[in-house]
Curated annotation (Swiss-Prot):
The protein, known as: Leucine-rich repeat and fibronectin type-III domain-containing protein 2
Residue ranges constituting the LRRNT domain according to the UniProt record: 21-52
Annotated Ig-like domain residues: 289-375
Extracellular side, ranges: 21-534
Region Disordered: start-end pairs: 383-423, 620-655, 668-707
Sequence ranges of Pro residues compositional bias: 642-651
């Protein structure tokens, strides 16, 4: 019966346990321990119905993303927790706070970016921490704080770690295995492994380490099994795949006996790619430091910042230290800052900083030094021997206070000064809106002055402005002042006080002045208005000039159009040509024979006569009448008058050419008549001369330059002549040709006789011009037929 009751009780307990097991999980009750196995079940989160008495929990191979505080709450008996091969990217702080019995935590093959200081809080008995194959880029300094003394196995391989909390690693005295391979580590702090006496395996493969700090722990890698103890086991050390810089700093590692030959050097250039254990010890050398650049001298006003630079090269890279003038090593403090590149910043300088600063560059091969001379220009202060000479209530650091107490004292820098006060030695002159000339004088009995200091400020504020002036100057121009403002100014003399070994200062004098008022805005507005007025005036002048020019052109155009019909009428009246073949011309308009129509009392336009006279010579040698137009244009351009161009005329013809001949012939006859009327002898000579060359003159004509002698004559009381043109053989030949047609001939071959009608225009030629025209054609070619 008792046996039956015991079996039923055991079955009931097993049924209760199975009933509490999460879905898709397997729960095992092994004696006193309870295991919950949920590997690769496709879980997206930690099942909430897990028995809190679980000792072993396996959740690997799922898709869990987040770990919260309630996921493992009250699991105080949990010893082994496996969260491998999930997609965990975030662990809420204090999520493992209740897992005080946990011995092993597997977080490998997840997506954790970092480990915060509270991520692993509460794991006080943790011995195995596996966090490999994640995306860890950083680990907080206190992340391992709760299990530093209990941790035995730490695996951080295959991450993106650039550094580790080396101080925490140094305190893991029970650590047996440390896997840091396949990371981005480039530095290991010296002395990190000094206390890790139980370390049996150290893996630093495939990092960026260029050197390893010498440590006695690495000597255990050569210890045999006979000499090994449980407290000092032999060390398995791997550091292949690192770009080792093979210099004197790795000589200690080269002297170790190793069995593998796979390590190679990454630098320097002469040893790059060579097997580490095959390189001779003599080739592991270093270069002493060399300072390449540093500050030589520096002048700083007391209280201001100073920057001292020092750069050095060497192999390995040297460390730079600074030594103050009092042989004190300068470090980082509230007043100074030392940087890794060798720069020293003094944030606030004092008089004690004056002197030589020493830059020391040191490495494993030696050291180099350089000196920087720092000079501090001290702020003015009174020494004990000169304090009684200062005016009452005058303070060197507050000129405004000293000057405001004496506003009614005539502009002095203090109250009622004694008779020998130095304020009178300062004069301010040539005051403008933005500048003033300050002059001062010092008595010959004064100590040797090193420098003068000019202090001034505006009466509207309390900001002092300092100007350092060499001792050789006794005047200074103060610029960049504000217009219409009062200023308080003092001049101080600085010299070395042998009693206090400090720079003593005494007031030479003080003064007050006001700058002149200025109105830049009004002047600017006036200049703008003046500039705009000038632009308007110039534009108006240009527009008026253009309008006047346009009006002149329009008036001239109208005058030309008005005169053109009159010119054409004059040309029509004065150029009446007819070809009669030697016969008498018929009556004009029914008028009696021998009587010509009276032309209107006009003077023929002068430019038309010029056209005929200047183109005459060219027309005689041309075979076409088109050359006459070009001769007219040339004669007009060479004339002495620039008359408006005549109205368009019809194309020149043979009749117009004959009119030119007649004009020249009538001119010569007119001249002969004038000569005959003066002297009897002249009449006979004129008659003979007229019969000799009057017919040849029109053909030759005077040169075109004689066209300026043309003058209009009145039409009344002048004889009118008519000449007939006889074609001679030309007409007979034309009639004899069959069909009344004859081959064309040159016009020059038929100019034998002509008939011209000219009214009132004579060409006054000189006698010598007529003589020059003789001999070209015979007088037989020209026959005067009739004269009316």
């Amino acid at each position: 019966m008792e046996t039956l009751l015991g079996g039923l009780l055991a079955f009931g307990m097993a049924f209760a346990v199975v009933d509490a097991c999460p879905k898709y999980c397997v729960c095992q009750n092994l004696s006193e321990s309870l295991g919950t196995l949920c590997p690769s079940k496709g879980l997206l989160f930690v099942p909430p119905d897990i028995d809190r008495r679980t000792v072993e929990l396996r959740l690997g191979g799922n898709f869990i993303i987040h770990i919260g505080r309630q996921d493992f709450a009250n699991m105080t008996g949990l010893v082994d927790l496996t969260l491998s091969r999930n997609t965990i990217s975030h662990i809420q702080p204090f999520s493992f706070l209740d897992l005080e019995s946990l011995r092993s935590l597997h977080l490998d093959s997840n997506r954790l970016p970092s480990l915060g200081e509270d991520t692993l809080r509460g794991l006080v008995n943790l011995q195995h921490l596996i966090v490999n194959n994640n995306q860890l880029g950083g680990i907080a300094d206190d992340a391992f704080e709760d299990f530093l003394l209990t941790l035995e196995d730490l695996d951080l391989s295959y991450n993106n770690l650039h550094g580790l909390p080396w101080d925490s690693v140094r305190r893991m005295v029970n650590l047996h295995q440390l896997s840091l391979d396949h990371n981005l580590l480039d530095h290991i702090a010296e002395g990190t492994f000094a206390d890790l006496q139980k370390l049996a395996r150290l893996d630093l493969t495939s990092n960026r380490l260029q050197k390893l700090p010498p440590d006695p722990i690495f000597a255990r890698s050569q210890a045999s099994l006979l000499t090994a103890t449980p407290f000092a086991p032999p060390l398995s050390f791997s550091f292949g795949g690192n770009p080792l810089h093979c210099n004197c700093e790795l000589l200690w590692l080269r002297r170790l006996e190793r069995d593998d030959d796979l390590k190679t050097c990454g630098s320097p250039g002469g040893l790059k790619g060579r097997y580490f254990w095959h390189i001779r010890e003599e080739e592991f050398v270093c270069e002493p430091p060399l300072i390449t650049q540093h500050t030589h001298k520096l002048l700083v006003l007391e209280g201001q910042a100073a920057t001292l630079k020092c750069k050095a090269i060497g192999d390995p890279s040297p460390l730079i230290h600074w030594v103050a003038p009092d042989d004190r090593l300068v470090g980082n403090s509230s007043r100074t800052a030392v940087y890794d590149n060798g720069t020293l910043d003094i944030l606030i300088t004092t008089s004690q900083d004056s002197g030589p600063f020493t830059c020391i560059a040191a490495n494993a091969a030696g050291e180099a030094t350089a000196t920087v001379e720092v000079s501090i220009v001290q702020l003015p202060h009174l020494s004990n021997s000169t304090s009684r000479m200062a005016p009452p209530k005058s303070r060197l650091s507050d000129i405004t206070g000293s000057s405001k107490t004496s506003r009614g004292g005539g502009g002095s820098g203090a109250g009622e000064p004694p008779k020998s006060t130095p304020e009178r030695a300062v004069l301010v002159s040539d005051v403008t809106t933005t500048s003033a000339l300050v002059k001062w004088s010092v008595s010959k009995s004064a100590p040797r002055v090193k420098m003068y200091q000019l202090q001034y400020n505006c009466s509207d504020d309390e900001v002092l402005i300092y100007r350092m002036i060499p001792a050789s100057n006794k005047a200074f121009v103060v610029n960049n002042l504000v217009s219409g403002t009062g200023y308080d100014l003092c001049v101080l003399a600085m010299w070395d006080d042998t009693a206090t070994t400090l720079t003593a200062t005494n007031i030479v004098g003080c003064a007050q002045f006001f700058t002149k008022a200025d109105y830049p805005q009004c002047q600017s507005m006036h200049s703008q208005i003046l500039g705009g007025t000038m632009i308007l005036v110039i534009g108006g002048i240009i527009v008026a000039t253009l309008l006047v020019f346009i009006v002149i052109l329009m008036v001239r155009y109208k005058v030309c159009n008005h005169d053109a019909p009159g010119k054409m009428a004059a040309a029509t009246v004065s150029n009446v040509y007819s070809q009669t073949n030697g016969a008498q011309p018929p009556p004009l308009g029914g008028m009696p024979v021998g009587q010509l129509p009276q032309a209107p009392p006009k003077v023929v336009v002068r430019n038309e006569l010029m056209d005929f006279s200047t183109s005459l010579a060219r027309a005689c040698d041309s075979s076409s009448s088109s050359s006459l137009g070009s001769g007219e244009a040339a004669g007009l351009s060479r004339g002495p008058w620039r008359l408006p161009p005549p109205a368009p005329r019809p194309k020149p013809s043979l009749d117009r050419l004959m009119g030119a001949f007649a004009s020249l012939d009538l001119k010569s006859q007119r001249k002969e008549e004038l000569l005959d009327s003066r002297t009897p002898a002249g009449r006979g000579a004129g008659t003979s001369a007229r019969g000799h060359h009057s017919d040849r003159e029109p053909l030759l004509g005077p040169p075109a330059t004689r066209a300026r002698s043309l003058l209009p004559l009145p039409l009344e009381g002048k004889a009118k002549r008519s000449h007939s043109f006889d074609m001679g053989d030309f007409a007979a030949a034309a009639a004899a040709a069959p069909g009344g047609y004859s081959p064309p001939r040159r016009v020059s071959n038929i100019w034998t006789k002509r008939s011209l009608s000219v009214n009132g225009m004579l060409l006054p030629f000189e006698e010598n011009d007529l003589v020059g025209a003789r001999g070209t054609f015979g007088s037989s070619e020209w026959v005067m037929e009739s004269t009316v």
